[in-house]
Amino acid sequence: FYDLSRPLLDVDERALALCREQFARLEEIKEYNQLKMLKAFTDCRVGGSHLVGTTGYGMDDAGRGKLEEVFAVLTGSEAALFRHNFMSGTHTLSVALFGVLRPGDRMVAVTGRPYDTLAGVIGIDGTHYGNLMEFGVQYDEVDLLADGTPDLAGIARKCRGAKMCYIQRSRGYAARPALSLEQIEAVSHAAKAVQPDIIVMVDNCYGEFTQKQEPTQRGADLMAGSLIKNPGG
């Protein structure tokens, strides 16, 4: 139709051949998670009554409650908050952090400095009022190693006595690789080996449904993400 040259088409075919194995792996993960999603809807007995609009005034919101039950099953979690009231990923992370941390607690960011918007929530940059550090929460961090992998020895050293081990799974705005579930599990083991009651929290933005399990099934105690990314399609 466009009179493309044969050499150009050959380049296209070779490029697709190089990517075919990775595409097949991603398709397999997609199909697995699709079936997992359908099974969760079935097991949670989602029905037409859960899709009817309601004000929620003077009664419960069965649809919202059922959606959160489904998401808890999908992530292997005890419970979930899965609702449009969270305006962004940073808002969701903030709610989780303020919900868990108290004055005098110490959080350790073990994947280096968090991205800018969350740095303001924590109080690292000193430009936002009402941040965690102003609330009396202490902050420390462990940089990634030169190859972009977690510094397990440094994590074990700094997480002793800490309340939270904070993991940013995606690269965010940095030029480093995202963390795999295997790496998240290794970080969790390193932190809990020195502080068994530490809360391992994962910023899972961009990470939902990219593998067959979620961080809460591989050592994380608390996970937060963004509905405008993977879960929202």
Please describe what each predicted stretch is.
Residues L4-R14, C19-R20, E27, K36-H50, ...:
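Conserved PLP-enzyme active-site core in the AAT-like
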